[in-house]
Amino acid sequence: MSEPRQILVTSALPYANGSIHLGHMLEYIQTDMWVRFQKLRGNQCIYVCADDAHGSAIMLRAEKEGITPEQLIANVQAEHSSDFADFLVDFDNFHSTHSDENRELSSLIYSRLREAGHIATRSVTQYFDPEKGMFLADRFIKGTCPKCAAEDQYGDNCEKCGATYAPTELKNPKSAISGATPVLRDSQHFFFKLPDFQAMLQQWTRSGTLQDAVANKLAEWLDSGLQEWDISRDAPYFGFEIPGEPGKYFYVWLDAPIGYMASFKNLCARRPELDFDAFWHEGSKAELYHFIGKDIVNFHALFWPAMLEGAGFRKPTAVNVHGYLTVNGAKMSKSRGTFIKARTYLDHLQPEYLRYYYAAKLGRGVDDLDLNLEDFVQKVNSDLVGKVVNIASRCAGFIHKGNEGVMVGGDAAPELTEAFLAAAPSIAEAYEARDFGRAMREIMALADRANAWIADKAPWSLAKQEGKQDEVQAICAQGINLFRQLVIFLKPVLPVLAADAEAFLNVAPLTWNDHLTRLENHQLNPFKALMSRIEPAKVEAMVAASKEDLLAAEAKAPAGNGELAKDPLSAEIEFDTFAAVDLRVALIVKAEAVAGADKLLQLTLDIGDERRNVFSGIKSAYPDPSKLEGRLTMMVANLKPRKMRFGVSEGMVMAAGPGGEEIYLLSPDSGAKPGQRIK
């Protein structure tokens, strides 16, 4: 038998500036399931996390609420801890980046990087708020977009036209904090020389530490050449002051990942059997895994391993990246009630419903996961109540009535027992690979076989026949043993169901290897309902409560002046209505003005195997139509041809904007090809 593995696991640190929602929970639930699986297998697996508790946003929110930043992060940490615990996320330690351990480790790593020559200093020019007496991050500056002239845009990118730019390019800049006009000032900043680690990162990112899609994306960064990373911020700032540099603070993204180390070090102080160095020092034999979302890959797969390498610590064994959560096929929406906080969910539904649904849909890739609320109800009710729990509820009564709760009768279905045993390695392999969806499919296939076998044997019919009691007992004992196997396989996902099943089965906490054994001549406890069906009305109430959360927030906020306020969303449509529209990528082969028409351009579009003639009212925005030639755009390809005075228009190109000169032709991402369907 192999030695137990030593494994340290982390999830990304939630920011201590707001509530946990179901999108966040996607990460913590999948990490918790993987950790529980490792522990079930007998491995030493430690799961640590912490609140990310530094930064200007926290400082400013605390000021707005009239409390100290320390009070704010303590309040948020209590809320986060409660939400995680009630969702059955079982951290070995949930700490804070605002801790003594994190201060010491951040200073240590910085000093080692500086001594090794990996820190540079130079003056940078930034906007400064003269009223607040502070330098402004890009997101705290608003003004007019230098590209499209849209107002009220952030200091780094325009939400209207998508342009990116330096804050100094923004027209009519204003501080989003005070409303004052910012002034430019110079300040000395500290930079981490990330290019020093280019060769190491090129090798490390291709060494199996990342999913292929993630490694390919990072290759784009690496191929274009890495830039030095600004790791300092000026006072006032809530965080750790850089040693020996009064008024200079570590940027939140420097000390945040060090929070993984700090949380583990804090745990080591309370658990003497744990050795910090054994897990973190260079050459460590322990395994280290980070679970993160795809939005923070660059920090965890470029900056973080480079910092560790430069400071003489070990690098992660792997960084496991996941996609975003959508609800009912769309981005979470406060107006539709699908931006659901963890606590709002818990006020209406059991946590294991969502744990199972996430498990059933999670693969090992970085694709987004959709929480379809109708499918959620159907799948949980069908799989967990209708299949798994149904086996126990079908069989338990006969054993209690016919034999006072004692299981007897031997193995009544050797071929089924063997099938369950044979499936265990594949299920374990799927769990290990984080392919939870595959594991759930294989487990439910076994549940289907067990239910079909019981239905075929029909103990309820045999119980009415004289002389069939022994057969009834053997069938039902077999059913309970199969149920026990399923509980073992599902235990990482459904810990409460497993604990309740263990109480019914009258057994000690089950381990993975218990699937190799059977219960014979064993006394059961009285059966109690293990899980109830989801009531659709409760899901509807949860959505309604989420809308109420929005109304409460809107009551406190000033009226918006964004694009939705100017042009509200249209009424909802059914998916089939949308699916009837055939959207395609199109190459603009030719573009020319239409004689006698003030607004029209005539476009010749290549959509792969054919060309289309399209008239479009975009002339005011594109006075030189020849500049459109060679550009990819998007078109409605199945629009009925329309006869116009100038000819027949065979489709419609897609554009955004209010009209006139403010029309912006839409373009697909690089790599798209003419004729490809837009999905």
Curated annotation (Swiss-Prot):
<keyword id="KW-0820">tRNA-binding</keyword>
<dbReference type="Pfam" id="PF19303">
    <property type="entry name" value="Anticodon_3"/>
</dbReference>
<keyword id="KW-0694">RNA-binding</keyword>
<dbReference type="InterPro" id="IPR014758">
    <property type="entry name" value="Met-tRNA_synth"/>
</dbReference>
<feature type="short sequence motif" description="'HIGH' region">
    <location>
        <begin position="14"/>
        <end position="24"/>
    </location>
</feature>
<dbReference type="InterPro" id="IPR015413">
    <property type="entry name" value="Methionyl/Leucyl_tRNA_Synth"/>
</dbReference>
<dbReference type="InterPro" id="IPR041872">
    <property type="entry name" value="Anticodon_Met"/>
</dbReference>
<dbReference type="GO" id="GO:0005524">
    <property type="term" value="F:ATP binding"/>
</dbReference>
<dbReference type="Pfam" id="PF01588">
    <property type="entry name" value="tRNA_bind"/>
</dbReference>
<feature type="domain" description="tRNA-binding">
    <location>
        <begin position="577"/>
        <end position="679"/>
    </location>
</feature>
<dbReference type="InterPro" id="IPR014729">
    <property type="entry name" value="Rossmann-like_a/b/a_fold"/>
</dbReference>
<keyword id="KW-0547">Nucleotide-binding</keyword>
<dbReference type="InterPro" id="IPR009080">
    <property type="entry name" value="tRNAsynth_Ia_anticodon-bd"/>
</dbReference>
<comment type="function">
    <text>Is required not only for elongation of protein synthesis but also for the initiation of all mRNA translation through initiator tRNA(fMet) aminoacylation.</text>
</comment>
<keyword id="KW-0067">ATP-binding</keyword>
<feature type="binding site">
    <location>
        <position position="334"/>
    </location>
    <ligand>
        <name>ATP</name>
    </ligand>
</feature>
<dbReference type="InterPro" id="IPR023458">
    <property type="entry name" value="Met-tRNA_ligase_1"/>
</dbReference>
<protein>
    <recommendedName>
        <fullName>Methionine--tRNA ligase</fullName>
        <ecNumber>6.1.1.10</ecNumber>
    </recommendedName>
</protein>
<dbReference type="InterPro" id="IPR012340">
    <property type="entry name" value="NA-bd_OB-fold"/>
</dbReference>
<dbReference type="GO" id="GO:0000049">
    <property type="term" value="F:tRNA binding"/>
</dbReference>
<comment type="similarity">
    <text>Belongs to the class-I aminoacyl-tRNA synthetase family. MetG type 1 subfamily.</text>
</comment>
<dbReference type="GO" id="GO:0004825">
    <property type="term" value="F:methionine-tRNA ligase activity"/>
</dbReference>
<feature type="binding site">
    <location>
        <position position="158"/>
    </location>
    <ligand>
        <name>Zn(2+)</name>
    </ligand>
</feature>
<dbReference type="InterPro" id="IPR004495">
    <property type="entry name" value="Met-tRNA-synth_bsu_C"/>
</dbReference>
<keyword id="KW-0963">Cytoplasm</keyword>
<dbReference type="InterPro" id="IPR033911">
    <property type="entry name" value="MetRS_core"/>
</dbReference>
<dbReference type="Pfam" id="PF09334">
    <property type="entry name" value="tRNA-synt_1g"/>
</dbReference>
<feature type="binding site">
    <location>
        <position position="145"/>
    </location>
    <ligand>
        <name>Zn(2+)</name>
    </ligand>
</feature>
<dbReference type="InterPro" id="IPR029038">
    <property type="entry name" value="MetRS_Zn"/>
</dbReference>
<keyword id="KW-0648">Protein biosynthesis</keyword>
<keyword id="KW-0862">Zinc</keyword>
<dbReference type="GO" id="GO:0006431">
    <property type="term" value="P:methionyl-tRNA aminoacylation"/>
</dbReference>
<dbReference type="InterPro" id="IPR002547">
    <property type="entry name" value="tRNA-bd_dom"/>
</dbReference>
<dbReference type="InterPro" id="IPR001412">
    <property type="entry name" value="aa-tRNA-synth_I_CS"/>
</dbReference>
<keyword id="KW-0030">Aminoacyl-tRNA synthetase</keyword>
<dbReference type="GO" id="GO:0005829">
    <property type="term" value="C:cytosol"/>
</dbReference>
<feature type="short sequence motif" description="'KMSKS' region">
    <location>
        <begin position="331"/>
        <end position="335"/>
    </location>
</feature>
<feature type="binding site">
    <location>
        <position position="161"/>
    </location>
    <ligand>
        <name>Zn(2+)</name>
    </ligand>
</feature>
<keyword id="KW-0479">Metal-binding</keyword>
<feature type="binding site">
    <location>
        <position position="148"/>
    </location>
    <ligand>
        <name>Zn(2+)</name>
    </ligand>
</feature>
<dbReference type="GO" id="GO:0046872">
    <property type="term" value="F:metal ion binding"/>
</dbReference>
<comment type="subunit">
    <text>Homodimer.</text>
</comment>
